[in-house]
């Protein structure tokens, strides 16, 4: 029985902070060695941090990575343990994303990434080149200062594996796990038993199962041990790397790390039986047949043993049940951890949130409350780094530290209700109640006097005073009056964030939190430079439907019972006067429901639909419920306001990335911001399709469709994408 103890890790790295990154790498190696591991793998580009972006183009970045590696090699950290360490390497003036394998203070091999990630949030081709030479390993000339430490002039560089006396090992890097022609296939057929994967994979709602299933299926098809490492935390941008380091053997997960955590270092180890891998493969006739005429892969021979001799009491680690968080938990824990990293690394003293009492701002408040709960829990569990950060941020003195989440929230979280004559008592009381449950320092600030002062100034300048629509004003006046209130709140929020610490004799500044959701961004249902303009936004990529589910969950599990009332209230901006016969509602203003918006967003981004293909898709999905002309009106209405408001996305607050149909303009959803909002060609094609469908007479309401329409039943067909949009607002409405 060949037994091998292996270790993987989650590391909370910070792009370009080499001190922090090096410290975490060293700590993870030390913990792996203490556990008796013979192999340790860390995250992708762990020495620099994955999110360096254009800093990768600087020679300094690669040079500093080599300096950090020299520190590791000269410090004896790799003595007795094979370490896979991620860093950028420049070879013949070309930059590669590499795993450097080190053992006993020497470099065994450098393995460049062969399949780069270049979609969604990833832009690896901007900074790196893929290694395309698979026939042979080449010699890499080491930097002189590294040669002095390792006593090596050159080391093998390229695609291949490492053959030890008792085990063969190779690597895949992040994206290569998901490619159609994955490296592990040829490697497994060449006898490689252990695969290490250094990853820089970010969180997205409902995404973890894809990652876990890929590892399971990889080792189920080919057999083997798969070690997966990942970053965890905010390393300086919109992404939260969600850890979940794990180890899989022959299709079973035998160890799984946390997906969301405040820890800087988490190490996971397992004792694996390599003979079980050999036995598994030998039992599959198709594997034996394919291995007999395999494509040979180059390798490096290392005369060293990694396995432990069998002793009584040594039992291979058995399978575990994989832990998946519910989407509501993902919304709670992912943004909470992201906010904590941002807070401690920005050196801010806390957060300020304009709390309106509505679903969006209440969700953000609950997330901050959840963050405070996580901090106190980790302190109770003995995390000294979290404790030190919390003491500094909360400005505790004389050895005091946070022991209660509400007390911590009082120190680092301001909430402000900025009401006007258009605000209701319901939202005011809900905001106050939630603030009390969380423990924030809450202020109720009326802003009518500021609004009145601006309107008086405008009247002196122009001789005119705008009126609300309910008072006989035009749409232009009505929108202008709403925007004044919204923008005053933004200015006041930033003023209070900078000055309230001074008022309370505290040092530092507060970060302003935004609370617009992904659907409002997609539709443009927000005022440019209102409270959607903030320092950061933890829910900017979360849908309204998911937020409402989160509110229901948080009311129970975070013990903020007032959130149940918040969730039950209809969404409203409260920017227009309330009358007996009129109450402003979001979905009426937008001319579409949030549910419809979610569908439009998924079709536009995930399924890459333009106006015509979206119309065709929705005609199929809403067959028997809406006529072709009704579907056409809805599609045109969406694309009209999407185009008109697209410019707002260019200045939207940096938001936590959570949703696959996010319209975030920075890198995820790159589009122009000046459109012909009439879409003349596309809309004409839709009109032609409607005429053809009406002419053919084939659009017949089915009995099933009629029943759905009468009952308002939502269709689950099409992977949950079909929805019966019964009772949606007038498509000609909107602002």
UniProtKB/Swiss-Prot annotation:
Its taxonomic placement starts with: Eukaryota, Viridiplantae, Streptophyta, Embryophyta, Tracheophyta
Protein family according to the UniProt entry:
In the C-terminal section; belongs to the NAD synthetase family.
* Keyword match Heme: no
Q: What is this protein called?
A: Glutamine-dependent NAD(+) synthetase
> Which top-level group of life is the source organism from?
Eukaryota
GO cellular component terms?
cytoplasm
Write down the species: Oryza sativa subsp. indica
Which UniProt keywords are listed?
A: ATP-binding, Ligase, NAD, Nucleotide-binding
The record's annotation in Gene3D superfamilies points to:
Carbon-nitrogen hydrolase (3.60.110.10), HUPs (3.40.50.620)
What pathway does the UniProt record associate with this protein?
A: Cofactor biosynthesis; NAD(+) biosynthesis; NAD(+) from deamido-NAD(+) (L-Gln route): step 1/1
Where, by residue number, does ATP bind? 354-361
Entry GO MF terms: ATP binding; glutaminase activity; NAD+ synthase (glutamine-hydrolyzing) activity
- One short Pfam name that applies is CN_hydrolase
Which EC numbers characterise this protein's activity in its record? 6.3.5.1
**Catalytic reaction equation(s):** deamido-NAD(+) + L-glutamine + ATP + H2O = L-glutamate + AMP + diphosphate + NAD(+) + H(+)
Write out the catalytic residues in the record.
44, 113, 174, 356
Region Ligase: start and end of each range?
Answer: 324-711
In this chain the CN hydrolase domain maps to 4-274
Does Zinc show up as a keyword for this record? no
Q: Which Gene Ontology BP terms does the record give? A: NAD biosynthetic process
């Amino acid at each position: 029985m060949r037994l091998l103890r292996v270790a993987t890790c989650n590391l909370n790295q910070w792009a370009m902070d080499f001190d922090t990154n090096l410290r975490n790498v060293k700590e993870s190696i030390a913990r792996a060695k203490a556990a008796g591991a013979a192999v340790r793998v860390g995250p992708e580009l762990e020495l620099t941090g994955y999110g360096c972006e254009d800093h990768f183009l600087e020679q300094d970045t690669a040079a500093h990575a080599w300096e950090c590696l020299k520190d590791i090699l000269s410090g004896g950290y790799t003595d007795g343990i094979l370490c896979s360490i991620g860093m950028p390497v420049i070879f013949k003036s070309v930059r590669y994303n590499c795993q450097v394998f080190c053992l006993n203070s020497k470099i065994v091999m450098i393995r460049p990434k062969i399949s780069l990630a270049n979609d969604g949030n990833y832009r690896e081709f901007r900074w790196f080149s893929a290694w395309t030479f698979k026939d042979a390993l080449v010699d890499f000339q080491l930097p002189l200062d590294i040669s002095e430490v390792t006593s090596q002039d050159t080391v093998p560089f390229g695609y291949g594996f490492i053959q030890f006396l008792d085990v063969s090992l190779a690597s895949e890097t992040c994206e290569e796990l998901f490619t159609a022609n994955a490296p592990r296939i040829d490697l497994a057929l060449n006898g490689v038993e252990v695969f290490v994967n250094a990853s820089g994979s970010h969180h997205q709602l409902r995404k973890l199962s894809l990652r876990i299933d890929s590892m399971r299926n990889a080792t189920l098809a080919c057999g083997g041990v798969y070690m997966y490492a990942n970053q965890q935390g905010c390393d300086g941008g919109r992404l939260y790397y969600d850890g979940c380091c794990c180890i899989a053997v022959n299709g079973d997960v035998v160890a799984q790390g946390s997906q969301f955590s405040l820890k800087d270092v988490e190490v996971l180890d397992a004792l694996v039986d390599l003979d079980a891998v050999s036995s598994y493969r030998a039992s599959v006739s198709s594997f034996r047949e394919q291995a007999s005429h395999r494509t040979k892969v180059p390798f490096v021979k290392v005369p060293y043993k990694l396995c432990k001799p069998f002793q009584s009491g040594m039992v291979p680690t058995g399978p575990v049940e994989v832990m998946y968080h519910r989407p509501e938990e993902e919304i709670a824990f992912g943004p909470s951890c992201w906010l904590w990293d941002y807070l401690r690394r920005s050196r801010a003293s806390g957060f300020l949130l304009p709390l309106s009492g509505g679903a969006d701002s209440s969700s953000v408040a609950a997330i901050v409350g959840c963050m405070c709960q996580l901090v106190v829990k980790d302190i109770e569990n003995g995390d000294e780094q979290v404790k030190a950060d919390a003491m500094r941020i909360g400005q505790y003195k004389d050895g005091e530290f946070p022991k209660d989440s509400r007390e911590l929230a009082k120190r680092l979280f301001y909430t402000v209700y900025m009401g006007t004559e258009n605000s209701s008592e319901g939202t005011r009381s809900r905001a106050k109640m939630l603030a009390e449950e969380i423990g924030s320092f809450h202020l109720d600030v009326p802003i009518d006097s500021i609004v009145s002062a601006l309107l008086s100034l405008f009247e002196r300048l122009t001789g005119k005073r705008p009126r609300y629509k309910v008072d006989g004003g035009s749409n232009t006046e009505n929108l202008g009056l709403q925007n004044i209130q919204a923008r005053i709140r933004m200015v006041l929020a930033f003023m209070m964030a900078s000055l309230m610490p001074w008022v309370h004799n505290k040092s530092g500044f507060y970060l302003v939190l935004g609370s617009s959701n992904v659907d409002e961004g997609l539709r443009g249902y927000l005022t440019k430079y209102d409270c959607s303009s903030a320092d950061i936004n933890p829910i900017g990529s979360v849908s309204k439907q998911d937020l409402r589910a989160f509110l229901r969950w948080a009311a129970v599990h975070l013990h903020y019972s007032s959130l149940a009332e918040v969730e039950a209230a209809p969404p409203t901006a409260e920017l227009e006067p309330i009358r007996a016969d009129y109450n402003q509602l979001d979905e009426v203003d937008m001319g579409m429901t949030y549910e419809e918006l979610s569908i439009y967003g998924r079709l536009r981004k995930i399924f890459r639909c333009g106006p015509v293909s979206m119309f065709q898709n929705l005609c199929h999905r809403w067959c028997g419920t809406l006529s072709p002309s009704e579907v056409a009106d809805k599609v045109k209405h969406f694309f009209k306001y999407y185009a008109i408001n697209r410019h707002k996305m260019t200045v939207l607050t940096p938001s936590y990335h959570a949703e696959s149909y996010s319209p975030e303009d920075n890198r995820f959803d790159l589009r122009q911001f000046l459109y012909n909002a009439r879409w003349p060609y596309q809309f004409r094609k839709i009109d032609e399709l409607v005429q053809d469908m009406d002419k053919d007479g084939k659009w017949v309401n089915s009995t099933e469709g009629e029943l759905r329409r009468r009952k308002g039943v939502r269709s689950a067909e099409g992977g949950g994408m079909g929805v019966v949009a019964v009772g949606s607002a007038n498509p000609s409405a909107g602002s």
